[in-house]
Every structure is written in C-alpha cells, then in structure tokens.
Amino acid sequence: MKEEISVCWFRRDLRLDDNAALYEALRGPYPVLPLFIFDTKILKKLSNREDPRVTFIHHTLQEIHSELATQGSTIAVEYGTPEEVWIQILKNYNVKAVYTNHDYEPNAIERDDALAEYLASEQIEFKTFKDQVIFEKNEILKADGKPYTVFTPYFNQWRAKLNEFYIKSYPINNYFNNLLKIASLPLPTLAEIGFKESSQKFPSKRFGSKLTDYEDKRDFPAVDATTHIGMHLRFGTISIREAAQQALKQKANKWLSELAWRDFYMMILWHFPRIVHQSFKPAYDNIQWLNNESDFEAWCEGKTGYPLVDAGMRQLNQTGYMHNRVRMVVASFLTKHLLIDWRWGEAYFAEKLLDYEMASNIGGWQWSCGCGNDAAPYFRVFNPELQAKKFDPDQAYINHWLPEYKQQKHVQPIVEHAFARERVLKVFKDALNE
C-alpha cells in the first residue's frame, strides 16, 4: 500500500519561506511532496529559446531542490500539460489532498477549476490560498458590495484595513519535518524542456536600502532608485507580506501604495477578465487605430527619433527591464503619437519584461491609452521631449542607452509631436462621439 501524501503545487510562489499553501499543507495530516510543472502550453508560446524567465525559474528550482534535500525531501519537477502531469502524479502516488495558491489570471482560473473537478472525481481534496497579494478578490469592496474601479478610494480602504494580521509571515520552518521523506528526484535540464541558459543578469532580492529615497527619486530613470523586485514578486521568490513589512518598517508610504496598485490591478482582472482582450471602457474599442507595422517596428527597436522613447525601448530589449516613468512615456507614445492599438504594445511587453504580470501590464497599458479604469484622460498626451527635460535633465539615461544621440547620429522623429497630438484628439473624439 502506497503512503498517503499531500502535494503542494508551486506556481507563482517559488520559495520555501512564508508560503501560504506550503504552510497549510505541512500543518495537514499527510507528508507533503512539493511539485512544479513546466507547463508546455505556456512554454510553447515563448518565441525565445533563451527566455531569461525560464532560466530564472530553473535556477530557483535548483535552489529549492537543494534546500529540500537538506531536509531529506525533494521537489517533483515535471514537464507537460497540467492535465497530463496530474494523471501521472495520481498513478505514482497515493494523493489525498492538493494544496496551491490562488492565481487570478483567466487561463489559470480555468486550469484550476478543471483540476478541482478532476480531483473531486478521484475523491481528492483541492485546497487553495491567498498568497501573492495582501488583499484579494472581494476583500476590499465599496459599501454597495461592488468592486472599486478607482484607485484612490480603494487605497484608502486598503490602507485602513492593513494591519499585522494581513502581513504576518507563515512560520514554515517549524513544520519542515512534515515534508515527504524521499530520495531526491531528478531535475530536468533546460535542454530537456527545450530551452537554453540565458546570460541575463537578474535583480537582487535585497531592496530595503532603496526605500529611503524612493519617493523623491523614483521618477528619474538615470538614478537607480527603484527596488527592481517586480520579477521576484511575479515569481514569488519574495513574499508580498515581507515586502509590505519592510515598507511599513521604513515608513515608505509611496512604495507601499505601489504594492496596493498591484493588488488593485489583480482585483480588477479577477472581477473583469474581459480586459485581457477588451478596453475596460468599451467605447474605446471603437478607436480607428492606424496600426502601421513599420512604425511599430521602429518603436520596438527604439528608432522613433524621440530619445527618451528610444532609450527606454533599448533598455527593455537589452535587459528585460524598463524604468516605470519611461514605461508610461513609451506606452503613451505608441498609442497616441503612433495610433497603434495598446494590445500590440502590451503583447510586446509580455514577451520582453522579466517582471511581466498580466494584471499590472494590462492595467498600465490601458491607463496610458486612456481606455482603462481610473485611466489618464485620453487628451493627456505626454510630450516625450518635455518628459526627458523634466526627468532626465542631464541626458544621463538617454546617453547610456542611446550612445548615438551624444554623437548626433540619432534618427529623425517619425512623427511631429504637435501633429500627432491633434490627430489623436480627433480620432479619440470621433470614436467616443464627443
């Protein structure tokens, strides 16, 4: 008779400390086998065989694998569709319960609903927990029970509700003896899952020192004043509770509000999954985009003739990261100066950003375009040259990512600002019948 076990399925929570599902699994009645699935449905969509995010996940799994070995346990790392893998897991083990953390993206919800149904048919419990946000789903609502769609009142309630209970870490170390005692299972190589090692450098998990000057310096792209932990929050290598604890400890209120924006966009995506393909404000889907492919290519390659836009795109293409102020500028430029559908830009960011999160990325793009909930008004058209003067006055950022600018070899602007502004105002007004 096979030993009865629980399985803890890791997804966007790649850490052994302060992990809600792992904590609950280890406190349950059965020894726990950790599991990670390299989902072929997701991997097949990645065009770059050296995608740095896959390398990052693989490195992180190696660390988890080694740490579990010191506890006399292991992590099962499988490759395939979740459906295929779970059928095999149930053949190999006597699974009594499955624990995992919530995911708010529509495809993930569909996947988890299907798994819950399958496990129920096998008389196996499926238990899910909040882990990647402070407040989720219906935890912050208006008095009428409806979700907030404007950030400021949402944040006021979020901040008022925030207390030690919601950010307390889960003391997992106390329960490591409840891990399944088993010889180490082999970890598939990157080559075995169809990828190659990326040479990309990844951001540090240490961010506390960045919080002191964050509010004053965060808008200046040449100053390394942001934490760069977006990637760690996205893959769960840092706990959101730990991040909030640090913010409160250092009274970094502006940075704390950025964590709340992340919660807000996750909540919006959960309540309004249609925003994956549609504008939050439906009227904006009437916009007659130009969608000129050569203009889009110039934007992607950082060859628009606007130095701040081009520097941002070069930074993105070379590092998988772009400063947040510059993200707003390049998104506004694509949608308003070039009249290219925000979905094109969102998809390009999804392909390139190491810290890509669907909820925040869609939220940011719709904000910049004007078509999102609580978005910038459509008639607010960033002037990239004024943005550069204000936030990169010494041109340190531009010169770093755009060396030809210093040598005066930079390309001419592909569209004139005043013309583009008048054009977009007319196109948007026509679409909105204003």
Q: Where is each model-derived feature located?
A:
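A broad detector of the eukaryotic-type serine/threonine protein kinase catalytic domain
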Residues: S73, T100-D103, R314-N317, T335, ...
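Glycine/tryptophan-enriched, flexible segments
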Residues: I124, G145-Y284, A388-E434
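Active-site-proximal binding-pocket segments
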Residues: E4, I124, D224-N399
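Alpha-helical packing segments of well-folded alpha/beta enzyme cores
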Residues: A21, T60, I64, A243, ...
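Hydrophobic alpha-helical segments, especially transmembrane helices
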Residues: R12, D113, D263, V326-M328, ...
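Trp/Phe/Arg-rich N-terminal binding region typifying the photolyase-homology
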Residues: M1-L162, K426-A431
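Charge-dense, low-complexity intrinsically disordered segments
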Residues: S47, D51-T55, W299, A388, ...
